[in-house]
Amino acid sequence: MNHLKDQSKSIVLGISSGIGIFLISGGINIFKNVGQYILNRINSNIYYRIDVDSKDKSFEWLLYWLSENDSIKVSNHLNAETVYNLVGKNPKVILVPSVGKHRIVYKGKWIWIDRVRDQQFDMGAGAPFESISISTYKSNAQLINQLLQEAMTLSLNRDIGKTVIYINGGNGNWERFGNPRSIRSLSSVILADDLKSKLIEDIKSFITNESWYRNRGIPYRRGYLLYGEPGNGKSSLINAIAGELNLDICIVSLSSKDIDDKQINHLLNNAPPKSILLIEDIDAAFKSHRDNVDSNNNNSNNNNSLTYSGLLNALDGVASQEGRILFMTTNKIELLDSALIREGRIDLKIKVSNATKSQAAQLFTHFYNLPTDNQLAIRFSENLHDHQLSMSQIQGFLLKYINSPEKAIEEVQSITPFNLN
């Protein structure tokens, strides 16, 4: 009987202890929640805060501003990021706030920076979501607005009169490639007939007629294919057009080992505003429909590869980006499947051929800064045949005689055509 009493006491004590622990832990949680609520209310009455999401353009502006701000460099924890410049120039290392809390002085006042990296991934971009919180005392609230305006102005001024180049990064996002390039003059790209004016007028018409497309239910996007022998200025023309129309260039590398159907869809539908999408040497990625059907069959179990159908869906799927200007280039149009360059995907096809005599004469006068119809230029071009040499071959020859146009004329017949394919 005593044994049963002892057991009953033990059970009662156990239950009482459990209830006590439960009540204590519950009380602690309630106390913590109430404390956090009170703290948040106090903070909301003392501090002013703005959150900037990594999906917004202002996130990039803010990071650039911070990298140029000396007061952030006294922080104990920074990230070193490499900025790649053009070929032949050394890359540049910039310092930006790492994930965590930082404090800077702006116009003599304290500003708190909190960079947060989410556990969640943006599956389309293949990168974690990020945000930056900027806070200060409520009495200094206007400083944050001034800071953001200053960050925007600094970033935009960096790009004024320049062409920004974006490339598809390994995480599926667009990344700036090096420093913005100086705008290339459209007059420096010498093409036959009126190809430049025809292309420029078509793009301008597209840009200014958005409402016309929308009113008729026509997808508001435009595609161009530049084709022809290599070395005749297809890429140079696109760079010059971007400069003329104040557009940036987003280069899509289909040969990247990291790119797949999901990423190409994300890239083509999330290009920075006021930019040209450029897919160079499309024939090298997709030579023909037959090749890619075989490739798709072989890779049917591989979810990490770009497929032909995946590219087509990205080009004109339901989610295709409105206002998109797309350029493709190829040296061999005959290798492209007709479905890839049909109307609706490619609206205008322009052949960029080897140099004519007229182009050679124009290049000569441009190279030596001579008047139009100069007799030296005419003599130079008379020694060449139409469509025999590429513009890059002629330019390469002239570079040997940068200070002697007469010598270039004497040696012009030494230029030997060769196949760049």
From Swiss-Prot:
InterPro entries recorded = AAA+_ATPase, ATPase_AAA_core, ATPase_AAA_CS, BCS1_N, Mitochondrial_chaperone_BCS1, P-loop_NTPase
User: Where is ATP annotated to bind?
Assistant: G228, E229, P230, G231, N232, G233, K234, S235
User: What does it catalyze?
Assistant: ATP + H2O = ADP + phosphate + H(+)
Primary location = mitochondrion
SUPFAM superfamilies, per database record = P-loop containing nucleoside triphosphate hydrolases
From the UniProt record, give one GO term of the biological process aspect.
chaperone-mediated protein complex assembly
In terms of PROSITE patterns, this protein maps to:
AAA (PS00674)
Pfam families noted in UniProt = AAA, AAA_lid_BCS1, BCS1_N
Give the subcellular location.
Answer: Mitochondrion inner membrane
What's its EC? 3.6.1.-
Topology, Mitochondrial matrix side: 32-421
Q: How does it sit in the membrane?
A: Single-pass membrane protein
Which GO cellular component terms are attached?
A: mitochondrial inner membrane; mitochondrion
KW DNA repair (keyword) present: no
Q: Which GO terms describe its molecular function?
A: ATP binding; ATP hydrolysis activity; protein transmembrane transporter activity
Membrane-crossing segments per the record: 11-31
| Family designation | Belongs to the AAA ATPase family. BCS1 subfamily.
- State the function annotated in the UniProt record: Chaperone necessary for the assembly of mitochondrial respiratory chain complex III.
Q: What's this protein's name?
A: Probable mitochondrial chaperone BCS1-A
Organism from which the protein derives: Dictyostelium discoideum
In the UniProt record, what gene is named as encoding this protein? bcs1la
